[in-house]
């Protein structure tokens, strides 16, 4: 197999990294932005959720666009948009971009909604590229490599942006976060996609061809599980740094260093989850249990570590437990996306948009709901809720059948 498809997979990983730098930049900058612009935690939670509202609403159109135009053009255009909107965010509070506290909140809500919409193509377009360029037997690991960019971007953001922020302010940190997006946008413009016929050396199975409908019970359960996974994962994307600083009382730089730990671990756990899933599929477990095993294990034990992190009084132990929970939550990404491809067939971009919309509906709720739960019930109980949701997400995989032979009954299920 040519190495060119895997070079494109690495560029997809770099694109995911750049997208997450633009996504989580406000979580870091928020430590100084909130007092500077007079925003409360609840207002900041709404701003975080505005990103996810735009991101979720545009998932399906973005997936359809990727199916029609291809990954290269869609991702190049999207990355240029991330740069432009992030620059406007850095100017928030200057001139006409918000002169009062209420106006400032509205400006940030609008800009975060727009950048969320602009980031919507990232993973549906990446899934469309992987489906076109990589044989099915290797799609678990390919998806794991791509989505490892989530961990890389999230790991880089706190330490790098905190250094920039402490020296030059939160506006400079936001601008710095957009530079990788500019680089990948230019890279996509100069990249040629391989010929599909030369890549698909392993033909899609008849099962995949027959199961292109997004109305199957398996696809609905897959999307529901990914929604619950998104609720848990986005707590760490948006609130972990502020949780460590404000609840566990670490200083800015130490909090930044510790908040990178989950993402450093996930750089390993995400591709590892895909590799393990591919090997289990190729081994005795077959397609059904081979794809189920990693999500069942990962989401269940993520819930266990969330509960341990919530109840410990030791701040350093909490960092370790919650970092392990994050790594396990994200280790399931490869199996989720590979299973979606096995169900969706040629409609991978659209199906990826539907599934990714689900996880971002969960992510839309958690950044806004978590500080409310923390304010009324305490952070411990807010994390207990997340632990229960993670275990529920794992249990849904018992009803997901990537292959017809693994379906719970011989009759097709639709909803």
Show which residues each predicted segment covers.
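Extracytoplasmic
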Residues: 7-41, 236-241
């Amino acid at each position: 197999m040519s190495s060119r498809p895997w070079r494109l997979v690495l560029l997809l990983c770099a694109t995911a990294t750049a997208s997450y730098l633009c996504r989580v930049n406000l979580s870091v900058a928020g430590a100084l932005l909130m007092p500077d612009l007079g925003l409360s935690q609840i207002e900041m939670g709404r701003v975080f959720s505005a990103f996810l509202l735009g991101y979720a609403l545009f998932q399906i159109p973005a997936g359809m666009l990727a199916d029609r135009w291809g990954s290269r053009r869609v991702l190049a255009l999207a990355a240029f948009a991330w740069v432009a909107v992030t620059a406007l965010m850095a100017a928030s509070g200057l001139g006409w971009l918000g002169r009062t506290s209420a106006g400032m909140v509205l400006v940030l809500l609008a800009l975060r909604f727009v950048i969320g919409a602009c980031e919507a193509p990232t993973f549906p377009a990446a899934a469309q590229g992987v489906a076109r360029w990589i044989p099915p037997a290797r799609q678990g690991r390919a998806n794991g490599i791509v989505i490892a960019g989530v961990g890389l971007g999230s790991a880089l953001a706190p330490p790098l942006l905190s250094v920039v922020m402490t020296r030059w302010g939160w506006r400079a940190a936001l601008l710095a976060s957009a530079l990788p997006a500019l680089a990948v946008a230019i890279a996509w413009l100069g990249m040629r996609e391989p010929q599909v016929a030369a890549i698909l050396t392993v033909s899609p199975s008849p099962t995949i061809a027959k199961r292109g409908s997004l109305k199957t019970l398996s696809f609905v359960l897959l999307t529901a599980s990914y929604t619950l996974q998104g609720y848990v994962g986005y707590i760490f994307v948006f609130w972990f740094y502020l949780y460590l600083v404000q609840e566990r009382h670490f200083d800015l730089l130490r909090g930044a260093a510790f908040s990178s730990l989950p993402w450093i671990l996930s750089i390993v756990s995400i591709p590892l989850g895909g590799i393990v899933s591919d090997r289990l599929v190729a081994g005795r477990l077959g397609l059904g249990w081979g794809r189920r095993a990693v999500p069942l294990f990962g989401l269940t034990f993520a819930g266990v570590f969330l509960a341990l992190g919530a109840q410990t009084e030791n701040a350093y132990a909490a960092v370790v437990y919650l970092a392990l929970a994050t790594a396990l939550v994200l280790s399931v990404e490869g199996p989720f996306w590979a299973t979606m491809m096995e169900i969706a067939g040629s409609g991978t971009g659209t199906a990826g948009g539907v599934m990714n919309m689900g996880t971002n509906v969960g992510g839309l709720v958690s950044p806004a709901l978590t500080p409310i739960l923390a304010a009324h019930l305490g952070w411990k109980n807010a994390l207990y809720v997340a632990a229960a949701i993670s275990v529920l997400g794992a249990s849904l995989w018992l009803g997901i059948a990537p292959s017809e032979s693994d379906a719970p009954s011989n009759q097709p299920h639709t909803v």
